[in-house]
Amino acid sequence: MTKVSILGAGSWGTALALVLADNQYDVCIWGHREELIQQINEHHENKDYLPGVKLSENVRATTDLEAAVADVKTIIVAVPTKAIREVLAQAVSFINQKAIFVHVSKGIEPDTLLRISEMMKEEIPAELREDIVVLSGPSHAEEVGLRHPTTVTVSADSSIESAQAIQDMFMNQNFRVYTNPDMIGVEIGGALKNVIALAAGITDGLGYGDNAKAALITRGLAEIARLGTKMGGNPLTFSGLTGIGDLIVTCTSVHSRNWRAGNMLGKGFKLDEVLEEMGMVVEGVRTTKAAYQLSKKFDVKMPITEALHKVLFDGEKVETAVESLMARVKTHEMEDLVNTFENQMK
């Protein structure tokens, strides 16, 4: 069997290991916690992050990074955004041939405002990169682990052939994979939906009901599309799986860490209390800071993102943030389209 390595022993990395094992790949999961790795190998289950999901015999785990990445042509990067640079910096010294690197995280680096593929280019020497591919879409690990029907998108930095190779690698009767040439749009949609999911959780925590959440999801998508398009993404991408698809599932499901975190904020918990209680990475918090900075850099109106930024980092009450959003100056719903049309008519 062909060997594939997954860097990251969390819920998503483990779920993807199950998909690849079902497709008859020899899967090696790398993680840094000795007790977790031992548990996966002994019980064929990740009880910490994906309990109840049994892994097949062709999935093994290791803390030895060299053993994980040496002689491997496909490396899945499934660690949180903040850990990607550190893990790749360690891994590159052990990689001995060109490989396709597939990242499955969703975020933006706050300090540099780089997308994940851009971060990876800085850490992986060109002579070791066959290509960089992103896999994204509405895909809770818990449901993938149960082999429920799931559909995602892959996009490659350099060639459609790389995207198609990863499509072939993952696709089976339970896990459908599309390709999309718009890597910028795919990455931005996947990252920014976490910001809107935090806000959606807040509205639920406040008990505001379906009307408020429907409006927030819709206007949140408008913010994502505005920024993503300004950064070079294709507007159509945001109407697809990595745009509205991922946004819906993350804003409405109890499986969503970002929704759960927002829900606690809406119920009055402080951010520090929320993060401690969650015990898992909540990407939307860091991404909110990055998205706010990007909105200023590209001069894009993102009122929901700005309001959430005030709640998370300036201590504003969630009720005050909602009041500010509702009191904004009246405007046309399709403001961007109207402005574009008017400019074309001049």
UniProtKB/Swiss-Prot annotation:
It is an enzyme of class 1 (oxidoreductase). NCBIfam families: PRK00094.1-2, PRK00094.1-3, PRK00094.1-4. Keywords: Cytoplasm, Lipid biosynthesis, Lipid metabolism, NAD, NADP, Nucleotide-binding, Oxidoreductase, Phospholipid biosynthesis, Phospholipid metabolism. Pathway: Membrane lipid metabolism; glycerophospholipid metabolism. It holds the Pfam family NAD_Gly3P_dh_C. SUPFAM superfamilies: 6-phosphogluconate dehydrogenase C-terminal domain-like, NAD(P)-binding Rossmann-fold domains. Catalyzes the reduction of the glycolytic intermediate dihydroxyacetone phosphate (DHAP) to sn-glycerol 3-phosphate (G3P), the key precursor for phospholipid synthesis. The active site is at K193. This is Glycerol-3-phosphate dehydrogenase [NAD(P)+]. It comes from the Bacteria. The lineage of its organism: Bacteria, Bacillati, Bacillota, Bacilli, Bacillales. Its EC number is 1.1.1.94.
